[in-house]
């Protein structure tokens, strides 16, 4: 594809560089530049991409898009200065890959909690109707029957990776792509998902998270609501299957109205809930250690649901998936039959069984809202102890740390605070901030609140304290494959570490 064909989405012909080379890729990392690439240089949090323009040129970049006026006239290949190169990256990538989102129905799922499970369940429910789906989520990527681990530690990849995956999905015959849409990716500052051509937007819930990035809770909500605004991005009469837009929201969330209001007027609006009046509703919910039972009523019929998923919050996740699939024409009975076969999502209320007399669950919960939901569900499931092992990420929202400690302190008999990606922060200081929250609600440091930075030792300590019938929760890491110390990811597998610790106690042999 020629440079001018890509740039026409950013500027008028009069402002195009005079030379129009063939472009072989759109790249933002100079280390990934290959001959013929268009290099996009922008200012990041830790580094300034403009400093790597010389390296990109040495590696064969054929053109450069940049934002710093200091580089005017200094780039010896065709170059274009834009107000914000990071924002420009997504439309450039979408153009280069031929706007693949326009060839499929695109489903976006956003919210503080539940995105990963909802995305996975939505893919399963759509496939129950015979569709081939692609998926982008925190845990896995999927194209048709091929699934592989997302090792990037990004729930929503950078724009070129998003568009490349969409291209691969379209070429593999997928009729749907289901994308986990984070607030960072949706924000106007990063704009990673522009050009994806969304058709269905799903909202799960919103609580406090990522205030270090968004600044305020209100801005955080507005950034998430951009997914619903993006339903208006592409509506071409030449593609009739893309003209129907659907907004799906959790009516139990007090902020759901702002998400409905953000959708274009022409979009269909569907709600789901457990407590509030809604189009799709679960009633008579029963939760046990083994799964969920509930009655679901919908505009497409009513039925009894029996899921193998643990935790009441998965009722909302399942309702969201059912709403999307049924709205797209999949019969309710087929959706439920498919969802009933799902054993769970890796790192999401994942049960670790080795014959031990207590329950061990691995979950990605790492926000105050997720803690509140999780502990309220787990506490009634045992008359014994609830023991929680968790930490809080370094260089992220500090305000949530004491809240995590406070919530865990209220619901758990024993709180064990440990490392979770301290990065360049003082690991002891992070742990102390969390422990202060637990101490504020009556936990005693060294007795009912233990501070053990070594996560492997923290897990073993929890198991040593556990008695028959207790529940041990290993929170925050979930599916992730590393713990970041400084800038170095150290390999880590929470479920595998739990199994090793149980084996040391004589279980699982």
UniProtKB/Swiss-Prot annotation:
Cellular component aspect of the GO annotation: cytoplasm
Domain of life per record: Bacteria
Enzyme Commission number, as recorded: 6.3.2.-
SUPFAM superfamilies: MurD-like peptide ligases, catalytic domain, MurD-like peptide ligases, peptide-binding domain, MurE/MurF N-terminal domain
Places the protein is found: Cytoplasm
Entry-annotated residues carrying N6-carboxylysine: 224
GO biological process, one term: peptidoglycan biosynthetic process
Entry keyword set: ATP-binding, Cell cycle, Cell division, Cell shape, Cell wall biogenesis/degradation, Cytoplasm, Ligase, Nucleotide-binding, Peptidoglycan synthesis
UniProt enzyme class: ligase
Binding-site residues, UDP-N-acetyl-alpha-D-muramoyl-L-alanyl-D-glutamate: 30, 155-156, 182, 192
Annotated metabolic or biological route of this protein: Cell wall biogenesis; peptidoglycan biosynthesis
Disulfide bonds: none
Binding-site positions, ATP: 111-117
PTM text: Carboxylation is probably crucial for Mg(2+) binding and, consequently, for the gamma-phosphate positioning of ATP.
Gene Ontology molecular function, alphabetical: acid-amino acid ligase activity; ATP binding; magnesium ion binding
Function: Catalyzes the addition of an amino acid to the nucleotide precursor UDP-N-acetylmuramoyl-L-alanyl-D-glutamate (UMAG) in the biosynthesis of bacterial cell-wall peptidoglycan.
Protein family according to the UniProt entry: Belongs to the MurCDEF family. MurE subfamily.
Protein name, entry field: UDP-N-acetylmuramyl-tripeptide synthetase
Protein source organism: Roseiflexus sp. (strain RS-1)
């Amino acid at each position: 594809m020629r440079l001018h064909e890509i740039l026409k989405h950013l500027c008028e012909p009069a402002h195009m560089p005079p030379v129009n080379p063939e472009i072989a890729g759109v790249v933002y990392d100079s280390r990934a530049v290959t001959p013929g690439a268009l290099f996009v240089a922008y200012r990041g949090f830790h580094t300034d991409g403009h400093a790597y323009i010389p390296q990109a040129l040495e590696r064969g970049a054929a053109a450069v898009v940049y934002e710093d006026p200091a580089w005017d006239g200094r780039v010896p290949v065709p170059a274009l200065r834009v107000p914000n190169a990071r924002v420009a990256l997504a439309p450039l990538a979408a153009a280069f890959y031929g706007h693949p989102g326009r060839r499929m129905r695109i489903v976006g799922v956003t919210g503080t909690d539940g995105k990963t499970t909802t995305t996975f369940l939505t893919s399963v429910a759509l496939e129950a109707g015979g569709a081939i789906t692609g998926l982008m989520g925190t845990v896995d990527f999927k194209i048709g029957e091929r699934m592989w681990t997302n090792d990037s530690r990004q729930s929503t990849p950078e724009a070129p990776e998003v568009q490349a995956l969409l291209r691969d999905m379209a070429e593999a015959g997928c009729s749907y792509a289901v994308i986990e849409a984070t607030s960072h990716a949706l924000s106007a500052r990063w704009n990673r998902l522009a050009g994806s051509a969304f058709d269905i937007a799903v909202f799960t819930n919103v609580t406090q998270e990522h205030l270090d990035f968004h600044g305020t809770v209100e801005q955080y909500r507005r950034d998430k609501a951009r997914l619903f605004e993006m339903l208006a991005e592409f509506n071409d009469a030449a593609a009739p299957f893309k003209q129907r837009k659907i907004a799906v929201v959790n009516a139990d969330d007090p902020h759901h109205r702002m998400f409905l209001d953000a959708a274009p007027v022409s979009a269909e609006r569907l709600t789901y809930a457990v407590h509030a009046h809604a189009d799709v509703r679960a009633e008579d919910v029963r939760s046990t250690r083994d799964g969920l039972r509930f009655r679901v009523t919908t505009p497409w019929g009513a039925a009894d649901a029996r899921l193998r998923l643990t935790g009441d919050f998965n009722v909302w996740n399942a309702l969201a998936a059912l709403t999307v699939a049924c709205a797209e024409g999949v019969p309710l009975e087929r959706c439920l039959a498919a969802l009933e076969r799902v054993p769970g999502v890796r790192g999401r209320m994942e049960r670790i069984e080795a014959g031990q007399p207590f329950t061990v669950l691995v979950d990605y919960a790492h926000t105050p809202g997720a803690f509140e939901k999780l502990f309220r569900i787990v506490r009634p499931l045992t008359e014994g102890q609830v023991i929680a092992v968790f930490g809080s990420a370094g260089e992220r929202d500090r305000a949530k740390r004491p809240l995590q400690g406070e919530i865990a302190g209220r619901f758990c008999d024993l709180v064990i605070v440990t490392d979770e990606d301290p990065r360049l922060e003082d690991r002891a200081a992070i742990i102390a901030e969390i422990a202060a929250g637990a101490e504020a609600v009556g936990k005693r440091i060294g007795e009912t609140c233990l501070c053990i930075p070594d996560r492997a030792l923290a897990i073993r300590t929890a198991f040593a304290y556990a008695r028959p019938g207790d529940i041990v929760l290993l929170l925050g890491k979930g599916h992730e494959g590393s713990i970041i110390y400084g800038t170095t990811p150290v390999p880590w597998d929470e479920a595998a570490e739990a199994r090793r610790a149980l084996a040391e106690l004589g279980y699982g042999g």
